[in-house]
Structures are given as C-alpha cells and as structure tokens.
UniProtKB/Swiss-Prot annotation:
Organism from which the protein derives: Streptomyces viridochromogenes (strain DSM 40736 / JCM 4977 / BCRC 1201 / Tue 494)
Family note: Belongs to the NRP synthetase family.
Full protein name: Phosphinothricin tripeptide synthetase PhsB
The record's note on its domains: Modular protein that contains a first peptidyl carrier protein domain which bears a phosphopantetheinyl arm to attach the activated amino acid, a condensation domain, an adenylation domain which activates the alanine residue into an aminoacyl-AMP ester and a second peptidyl carrier protein domain.
Disruption phenotype: Mutant cannot produce PTT. PhsB cannot take on the function of PhsC and vice versa.
Lineage per the UniProt record: Bacteria, Bacillati, Actinomycetota, Actinomycetes, Kitasatosporales
Region Disordered, residue ranges: 75-97, 454-476, 1045-1081
Residue stretches of biased makeup (Basic and acidic residues): 455-472
C-alpha cells in the first residue's frame, strides 16, 4: 500500500475522506475504493465531502469513473485547468419558514398520487423499534417533541395554493403518543395482535393538507418488552431519514434519562430550504441530463411482463403484501468477494443476479430495474430528515447469452453511468420519456431493487441506545411497483424482503422467488463463467416434480395388446354389436356396424388389388357421407395410410398434396371430380359409381394385420415456408388417444355423437373412431352443415345427440342461436382447436348447466390431443389441464431446461402420442422432434411452438404462440404460408399478414401489402384476391388488403405488428362494387352486411366473403337476416349466394316459400330488377365462399 503523498494536498484529502468513510486508518492513493468495500451510498457521500473540502465542483460520475484517490485527483486537477474560476457548490440559503415553499421534485408525484387515490397507503413509511426493560413514556414523549421541533419537515403541511401544491412549515405540531396494552392477552396471542395493530397503523391514511406527519404508538408486549411503531407519509421521509430518527431518538432518550443535555449538532438548513435550491441547481443541468437519459433508454420495452397469477387490471390499485427471505452467509460472502475482485459494489453484483432472475422468469433480455438512490449530494443534507431519495432506472442487458461474470461487468458499467446522472428527478424523466401512460402499470419501471445500505446500515445499529430496529414493522397492504426487492445486511448474511402487487401475484408465488434467487446466485457465484441461461432456478426435487411426478402417466388402457391398431380396435366392437346403428345421415339413412365393416372390407380388398404396399398413401376427397367413413376405414384395413383432402380446395393445392404425398389412389365422389386436378400416377376411384370388377372382386381373402408402429394417416397442416407439411401419425399413438377417451368418457345408454369436423382436421379422427370403438351411433352432419349453428342446434335435438365437439369460436356462435329445449339429450361438449375463454365457458354453463364441458389440447404432431381439463364455472382461467395417459408435457426454456411453475416457456410434448415426423421433410423433422432428455431411453419429444406454464398444482395453462402460427376459427395456419403465396406475385414488394379483430367471431386475416409500383392499389387487391382464391383454402384467404408505403419495423429491424394500421385506417374490406342496392331487400341486407363487416358502403355486386366475411360472420349475418325478414335462413344460403343481389333474391324467395303473403313481395322484387340484371342472374349456385369452421 502506497502512503498518501503529502505534497499532493488534493490526493491526500481525497484519500483521507475515503478512509473515514471506509472506517480505515488510511488507504493508498492507487487503491480502488470499491475493491475496499465502498458502496454507491459512500460514493455519494464522498462526492459531497470532496466538493466541500476542496471547494470545487465535482460531478458524481467522476467518483464512479475514477475509483482511486490518485485518479480522482488527476481528474479534478484537469477540470480546474479548463475552468480555473470554478468553485464548489454554494451553501443552501435559508428561506422564510413562515411562507409557503414549492415542493421538491421528489414530493410532487407523491402529492399528486395522494390527490388521485386519497387514503391509499402505498406511499406510507412504517417501521418498528423494539425496546427491552422499563420504558419511560414521559421521556419518550419529550423525545418525540424534540425531534419534531428539530426537523421542520415533520411540522410541514401541504396545502394547495392557486391550484398548485405547496409546503408550509407550522410553528408546532402535536404528536400524541398512542398506546396498546397487550399484556392481558395470552402470550401466544400477543404477536398476532401486535401484527394486526401494526398493519392497521401502516394502512391508516394521512391528511397531507392538515397533518400531523408522524404517528407514534407503543405496544406493551410484557412488563419489560415494548414495540414502538413509527408511521409517516413518504412525502416527508425516506430510508436515510428513518435512520436519522432512530439515531436521534436513541441519543435523546439516553440524554434525558441520564439527566444531561442532548448534544445533537445544529442543522445548517431545513428541508424547505433545500426545495428552493434544488430547482435552481437543476435548471443548469437538466437539458444535458435529459439528453443522456433519452439516448440511454431509447427503445427500452415499456413493460416488464412478470409471470402473474391474474391478468393485469385496467387500473393499478397498488394493493400489496410483503414477504421475508434469507440470503445465506455463504452466498453473501462470495457476492461481496466478487464485487471486490471486479472493483464494483455488492449492489452491482446483486443487481446482476436479480436481472438474471428476471430474465429467466420473463424471457426478456432488455430490462429496466429501478434503484433508489440517496439523493443527498451535499454534506449539509446528511443529517436532515426529508424526502431526498430519487429513483434511477438501470437498464440491464442480458442479450447474447452472457456468462454471469460478463453480466456483472455489463451491469457495473450501466450502474456507474446511471448513478453518475442520478440528479435528474425520476418523475422528470417519466414526463419526458413516457408522456402517454397506461393506468395499468407504473411508467418506465415496474420492478425495483433496493440495497438498503444507508450510513447506519453498514453493519451497525443506527446509534447506540435502547431502541433497535425490527426486521419488518408492519405491512402497509400496498405496493408501489409490481415487485420490489429490499435487501439489508444481517448477522447471517443478507435479509431480503419482497414487496409485491397482490392484484397480480399470489403470496405462494412470491414465496418461490426468494429460493429461486438464492439458488441462481449460489450457482452463479460458484461458476461465474456459466451462461446465465444455464443457471438453475430450482432445487433438484422441485425440478423432478415437474418433469417426473406431473408426467407420471404410464397406464395400460382398455382393449389390451390387440387394440393397438384402429382396424383391430374397431373390428372388435363390430363383433360385439354387429346390428347396432353405426352411422346415420342427415336424411335418416343408416348403416349398422356389420354393414359398415362389410363395405369397408370390400373396398379394402379392392385397394389391395391395385398392388398397394403397407403404408401406401391413399387420398380421400369426400364430403361427409357413408362413402367417406367407409373409405377411411377401408384404407386403414388395407394397411395403408389415408390422406384427407377437402374437395373444395383449389385444384392447385390438391395437386400439390397428391404430388408431395405420393398418393397411389384417390377415393372420391363423382360430384367432386370436376374440381379435382389431373393426377398423373394416381388412380381415381369414384365411390358412388359401380365397381368395374363387379362380381369378380375378391371377398374372402384375409386382410393384413396392422402393427402399432404402422402409418395410419397423413394430414397436411399449414407451413411457414409457403408449402403445407404432412404429419405422419401411426396407429399406436392414435389408439392411445382413442382408448384413453373410451375410459375417460365411457359411452352411456344411447350415446350418439355428431360428426361435423372436416376430415382434414385431426379432431375428426377421434370424433369418428372413438364413437365406432364404443358401439355408439355416429350422426353425420350434412356437408357444410358444420358452419351453420342453427342447423347444428336442430340436429342435436332431432337426433338426440349426447356428445359434440366445437372449436370455441363456433361454440360462441352456437350459443348465440338460443338454448336447447328442456329435456335435451346433450351430455358432453368437447372443445379444442383454440383457446377457450372463461367468459365463453360460463356462457355455456349458464345456458346448459347440466352439460359437461371438457377442454382438450394437442397439435396434429401429437395424435390429436395430449392434455385434458374438465371445466368448472367461475374459475379465473380455463387451463388445458394435465397430460392424458402415456403422454408427457414439459415447459422448457430456450436451453431445454424446465422453467419453474408460473413461468412461461415453450410446451414440448413427449410419450406415446408423438408423431413419426413430417413426410419427406427430414430437416424439419430433426428440428421439431428431438430426443427426450427427461423420458425413457430412445424416446422423443415434439416442439409445439406453444407457450404455456405450469400452475403450482401441476395443471397446464396455455398462453399463446411464440411464432407466426395462429388458430383462426379452429383452423391451424401459418401466416408465413399466406405471406409466401402473396409475395410470389411480381407486383408485391413486401407483405405481412396478421389476424385482426376482437372477439373470437370477429377475428379475420388482413394482408398488408407494399406494392412494387405505386398507383395501382385497387387493381393489385383484385389480383391478390384472385391469387389467394386459386392457391389457398378458403380459411387461409385474407378478408382485407391494406396497402402501405412501408412496413413498420421495431428498433431491432423486425416487423412491428403492433404498429400495423387497423384495416379501417387503410382499406376497409372492399365494398361498394357495382350498382347501389336497388330493392328494399337489398337495402336492408346491405345495412346488415355493412354493420357486421365494418364496411362503408356495400354494393349490389359485392361478394360477402370477398369484403371481409367468413363462416362465423355468415352465421351471424343469416341470423340477423332471419330476424329482419321473419324467415329461417340456413347459413348455407350465404355460401350458395354470396353476392348481395343474389342473396337478397334468395331471401325473398325463401319468404315466398313459407308465406303465401310474401308472393307479392317477390314479384315486386323481380319487377324492380332491370332486364339486364335479370339476364345476369346465375343459373347455378354462386361462387364458393366456403371457410373453415
């Protein structure tokens, strides 16, 4: 250690000041004070003392950036050479205490908050002191009066003068000494009673306009034990001030009881004097400080999304709680050691650990953490009670997978830079950077870290005497921020205390944070080179509970080993109930189990006659019919895999599916052949035409056995690259789902299931085969009937349906058409395909109180569904539940580590249900299907792309998607596939597709297009509509096209979807085409369409589906039209006549058919049409505007 150089007075004085603050005899001039244990509070005090001792200006940043006496002296000499006349800060001038003074910048937001939420205890400071022995209440009362007399701020009130807040010092303030005697209570009850009184004291409001500003209450716990409760509004105090009060109370009490005069040093200024000086000082530096902060915080996210137990309310109520935890001495010692090694403060290391925890909890890598700083940048304020504390917003950068040591170094730099500019009041920063604020959360900062190392908390009590601080004086029942971590030193390490928003977080969740922080810090300090992303958050037992106990689903399901293929499972039931009705159609036709299997066996043998090998792909393009079910079952019995195709899809898409899958045979109906493409190499079999082989067909040979690992079906889903991708599902996983359903939902007497899901969606698999494996009857909805909620309601009643599946958006439309009659047969409703909202769930229970509602989840890549939850009314959320039999679910971070309960992560699916992979896409299969590190050897898991979280009870909650995949009216689609299709047109320079709309029935696809050439917007929209109609299925076609000059980007260069304009601000769904509506019916319908579609004007030639309509809106539209015209209109009418003029004529025709009095209206409607319009009326059904369910 080099002794201070006596010939360098500046260096010597700086070294002496630091030695005093560090409680050392001396320090070397080249010593890094932060390696010697200096804290940020010490740096502020050192700056104030050096300014005064050397009579020189000294920016706080210089102290942080020049951490040795020699380096700081060199910087001071350099600044003097460039500004030789500069001198230190002037003393604060006393002001007239009888006049009103302005508030300080720190007080202004507190005063405003009190005005906005009077009685809210958020900004109340409350702490407790313990006392042992005899307490002289008279002496204590005298001490309190002395303190109030000494510190004018405790005699200050805050009136409004000319509509502006002000502070006014009173000559005197009476502070009554409250008492609560608990000695009469049993000793075991006293702590509870004391806590109740402390909470009441902490939560009682203050009247800032009249005072008093201090409450003191003594709790008598025994004859020799007392607790002193002190409560003040934050507008007059801070943590530093609290220690001053404790120190002075101790000094005064000791002096008065000893009969000697108190020796407290006189105060050079009072708080209201400082208020005037603060504004004058800031006036000269504010612009420079604002410039720095504006640049430093550019692009910072406005909200830190901590995992919460409840959704954030529209208006923050600041209700809260507090919870203590310990940071062990072994962790504290290593934390302080790392700080010294890195030449930084323990606060910087603790903040790095806290930022790492927040990063792991939220997935965000750009974090803003608030830190309270003392704000006492002048020595004359060190002994003054008052609100000086300021909040500094520290930006923590966790991007790029840093090690913990790298994160500490990053944090040290930003702490130094930010603390060096702490003079700017936080609320001025808020006014500048967040002028428009949400009432739901605090601006800029929602999380705070407060290392409470005020001068009297550096390992010492705040003044020797009879009163000692207790760890927590009482819960105010409020919280300033979403989450605050207070940390103080303790005899066994550090003591942490969480203050949390109880509207967001359960106490149990917050209780998990302390152990998680300690576990993370312990590992990080043991291996500082370890990436933050790999640091553990949980003890092994907690981790094992999630990946093992909550996935303990191994089970032997009904049917035994002979039920591991669909043909075996279904044939066994046919043998048990051969004469039971298996299928029933809309017109009452029926097939028994015997008839169904005879037909399927005959077709299976016909397929085998084409030389098909096991797992050959056979395409099935059929509307709902007997032939459709027979075809599917026959393909399976032949040992082949079926490829379902929507016969209404564009021919180009169908051709791609046939070509990509290598389908050898296409099974269809004659009426579909005109819409099918030429399929080279594919044999087309029309099922409703005679078999050319006639009586020559083999009817006796045995059909092949099917292994569980054999391919059952190939279903194509939307692909992000612009190409659909085929998912390969085997018999074993599918049978696992069917057999689990047989046990979970056993059929009762007369079980009847409505089959309404198109076969190219995998829900149809269990809809059909669960029914046919249990002996129940499958009622086939008419083709396109699944889009018509009124029709479906009728079928449920007429057929006595007991079980039905809905995607949530269609369930909402179904509930809109009215209740089922008394005595209806419906027992169970199944939901999947979209998130089920609590509101929709409760609507169903209100309408159908005795019906079971089951929420299921699963992608096509995991055999239909892998989780299940039976819903109950009134719960705050609708979970997706727990894994079904033999399924495993993991919620993992980007490193494939399990995340703690409550923390969002990506949902990975394992166990028996996992599909084989993607057909012909080995690269994508390797990317999405990985070895399962938590399952049995050789098992795999599937990356779903869904965000989820575990509840603490082992139940899963779905949180949405992390990529461009969306679910729209139950249809899974990749926005990238739509974008790629549209971007392929030469006139498109850039395109973004997004989902817009509020409720589930209003959501629609909108394409935002930047044209390659300006001035051709309308022509381009028409061209893109035609392109989408030719290449995309109806459910993937955008309803609206909005042209943009440029696509908005985030600061990181990604598409900013939140900044995309509402369709109404760009292009309303195209409308107003052709002549204006001319007949009364057209005008009535045009108004209905315009209201539903948000269109400005609707023309007579507008197509409902081209101007923004979809199947659910069609259901609402026909419902309104039915009411308006007094006639029941099926939803199919909108698909058959999607043009307004045609639809209007169809409506009045329907009226005429049901009401003879409407005949005249029909004639009037026809007469109102011009001859040319009559000639233009279609002879056949209008264009197909079909959409998915």
């Amino acid at each position: 250690m080099t002794a201070p150089q006596t010939d360098d007075v500046v260096t010597g004085r700086i070294a002496a000041i630091w030695a005093g603050l560090l409680d050392r005899p001396e320090i070397g001039i080249d010593d890094n004070v932060f390696r010697l244990g200096a804290s940020s509070v010490m740096a502020v005090r050192a700056a104030a003392r050096i300014r005064e001792a050397l009579d020189t200006p000294l920016p706080l940043r210089d102290v942080f950036e020049s951490p040795s006496p020699a380096a700081l002296a060199k910087r001071i000499r350099a600044s003097r050479s460039t500004a030789p006349t500069a001198s230190g800060p002037p003393r604060t001038a006393p002001v007239d205490s009888t006049a009103t003074a302005p508030l300080t910048f720190q007080q202004e937001p507190m005063w405003l908050f009190d005005r906005m939420q009077p009685g809210n205890a958020t900004y109340t400071i409350h702490f407790a002191l313990r006392h042992e022995g005899h307490l002289d209440l008279g002496v204590l009362d005298r001490c309190v009066r002395d303190v109030v007399r000494r510190h004018a701020v405790l005699r200050t009130v805050f009136p409004s003068v000319d509509d502006r807040p002000a502070q006014q010092v009173l000559d005197r303030a009476h502070i009554p000494l409250g008492e609560s005697d608990l000695r009469a209570l049993p000793e075991a009850e006293r702590p509870v009673a004391a806590a109740r009184i402390a909470a009441r004291e902490a939560q009682a409001p203050f009247d800032l306009s009249t005072g008093p500003m201090l409450r003191v209450r003594v709790l008598h716990l025994s004859d020799t034990r007392q607790r002193l409760l002190l409560t003040m509004p934050h507008i007059v105090t801070d943590a530093w001030s609290d220690d001053i009060l404790v120190r002075e109370l101790n000094h005064l009490y000791r002096a008065h009881t000893d009969g000697i005069a108190p020796a407290l040093p006189p105060l050079p200024v009072q708080y209201h004097d400082w208020a005037a000086r603060q504004r004058a000082e800031l006036a000269g530096t504010e612009a420079e400080l604002l410039d720095w902060w504006r640049h430093h915080l550019a692009g910072v996210p406005p909200l830190l999304e901590l995992p919460a137990d409840r959704p954030r309310a529209a208006v923050k109520r600041h209700r809260g709680g507090r919870l203590l935890f310990d940071i062990p001495e072994s962790v504290t010692r290593r934390l302080e050691g790392l700080a010294k090694d890195e030449g930084t403060t323990p606060y910087a290391v603790l903040l790095a650990g806290f930022a790492a925890l927040l990063h792991r909890l939220t997935g965000q890598d750009d974090l803003l953490v608030g830190s309270p700083v003392a704000g006492r940048t002048h020595t004359e304020t060190e002994g003054l009670v008052g609100l000086f504390v300021n909040t500094v917003a520290v930006r923590c950068d966790v991007a790029g997978r840093p090690s913990f040591l790298e994160l500490v170094r990053r944090t040290r730099r930003t702490v130094v830079e930010s603390f060096a500019r702490q003079e700017l009041p936080f609320h001025r920063l808020v006014e500048e950077l967040a002028p428009v604020r949400s009432p739901a959360y605090t601006p800029l900062v929602q999380v705070m870290l407060a290392l409470q190392n005020t001068p009297d908390r550096d390992g010492r009590e705040p003044g020797e005497g009879p009163f000692a601080r207790e760890e927590s004086g009482g819960d105010t029942g409020s919280a300033m921020f979403d989450l605050t971590l207070f940390v103080t030193g303790s005899a066994s390490g550090m003591r942490g205390e969480w203050e949390y928003d109880s509207d967001l977080f359960d106490r149990e969740r917050v209780a998990e944070l302390g152990p998680q922080l300690v576990t993370l810090l312990d590992a990080a300090l043991d291996r500082t080179d370890l990436p933050v992303a790999l640091l553990p958050l949980q003890e092994p037992a907690a981790r094992d509970r999630m990946v093992q106990a909550w996935n303990d689903t191994a089970d032997v399901l009904p049917g035994g080993p002979d039920a591991d293929s669909l043909p075996a499972l279904l044939s066994a039931q046919a043998h048990r109930t051969p004469d039971a009705v298996a299928l029933r159609t809309d017109d009452g036709a029926e097939l028994t189990y015997r008839q169904l299997h005879l037909r399927a066996d005959r077709l299976a043998r016909r397929l085998l006659s084409y030389g098909l090998a096991p797992e050959s792909v056979v395409a099935v393009a059929c509307e709902r019919s007997f032939e459709m079910v027979v075809a599917l079952l026959a393909v399976l019995k032949a040992g082949c895999a079926y490829l379902p195709i929507d016969p209404g899809d564009p021919a180009e898409r169908t051709a791609y599916l046939l070509r990509d899958s290598g389908a050898r045979v296409l099974l269809t109906l004659h009426r579909h052949t005109a819409n099918l493409p030429d399929a080279d190499g594919t044999t087309v079999v029309t099922l409703d035409e005679p078999d050319p082989s006639g009586d020559m067909q083999d009817t006796t040979s045995a059909l092949p056995g099917i292994a569980p690992g054999q391919l059952a079906y190939l279903i194509y889903t939307s692909g992000s690259t612009g190409r659909p991708k085929g998912v390969l599902n085997e018999h074993g996983p599918v049978c696992n789902r069917i057999r689990w359903g047989m046990r979970a939902f056993p059929p009762g007497p007369g079980t009847i299931v409505l089959q309404k899901t198109p076969i190219h969606f995998d829900v149809s698999v269990w809809e059909m085969f669960w029914t046919l494996a249990t002996g129940a009857t499958l009622v086939l909805a008419r083709p396109d009937g699944h889009r018509d909620p009124q029709y479906l309601a009728g079928r449920l009643v007429e057929e006595g349906v007991t079980d039905v599946h809905f995607v949530p958006s269609m369930l909402a439309a179904f509930l809109d058409v009215g209740a089922l009659p008394e005595g209806h047969s419906l027992r169970r409703v199944f939901c999947s395909g979209e998130a089920l909202s609590p509101g929709l769930r409760d609507r169903l229970f209100a309408r159908l109180p005795h019906v079971e509602l089951h929420n299921l989840y699963g992608p096509t890549e995991a055999a239909i569904e892998v989780t299940h939850w039976r819903c109950r009314p009134g719960e705050p959320t609708v979970p997706i539940g727990r894994p079904i039999a033999n399924a495993r679910c993991y919620v993992l971070d980007a490193e494939l580590n399990p995340v703690p309960p409550g923390v969002p992560g990506e949902l990975w699916l394992g166990g028996v249900p996992v599909a084989r992979g993607y057909h012909g896409r080995a690269d994508l299969t390797a990317e999405r299907f990985l070895p399962d590190p938590y399952g049995p050897a050789g098992s795999r898991m599937y990356r779903s792309g869904d965000l989820a979280r575990w509840r603490r009870d082992g139940v899963l909650e779905y949180l949405g998607r992390e990529d461009g995949q969306v679910k729209l009216r139950g249809q899974r689609l990749e926005l990238g596939e739509i974008e790629a299709t549209l971007a392929g047109h030469a006139e498109v320079a850039d395109v973004v597709v997004d989902v817009r709309g509020t409720g589930p029935q209003d959501r629609r696809l909108v394409a935002y297009v930047r044209p390659a050439r300006p001035g051709r917007d309308e022509q381009l929209r028409t061209t893109l509509r035609e392109l989408a109609a030719a290449r995309l299925p109806a459910y993937m076609r955008p309803s609206s096209y909005v042209t943009l000059d440029r696509v908005p980007l985030t600061p990181s260069g990604k598409t900013d979807r939140k900044a995309l304009p509402d369709p109404a601000a760009g292009e309303q769904p195209r409308s107003g085409r052709g002549a204006a509506p001319g007949t009364p019916a057209e005008r009535e319908l045009a108004g209905i369409w315009a209201e539903l579609l948000g269109a400005g004007e609707v023309g007579g030639d507008d197509n409902f589906f081209e101007i923004g309509g979809h199947s659910l809106l069609a259901a609402r539209m026909t419902g309104r039209a039915s009411t308006a015209f007094g006639v029941d209109l099926p939803v199919s009418l909108a698909f058959e006549h999607p043009v307004l003029r045609d639809f209007a004529l169809a409506v009045v025709t329907a009226q005429a058919a049901t009401d003879s009095a409407a005949t005249e209206r029909l004639l009037a409607e026809l007469e109102a049409l011009a001859d040319t319009e009559l000639e233009a009326l279609p002879d056949e059904d209008g264009p197909d505007g079909r959409s998915g369910e």
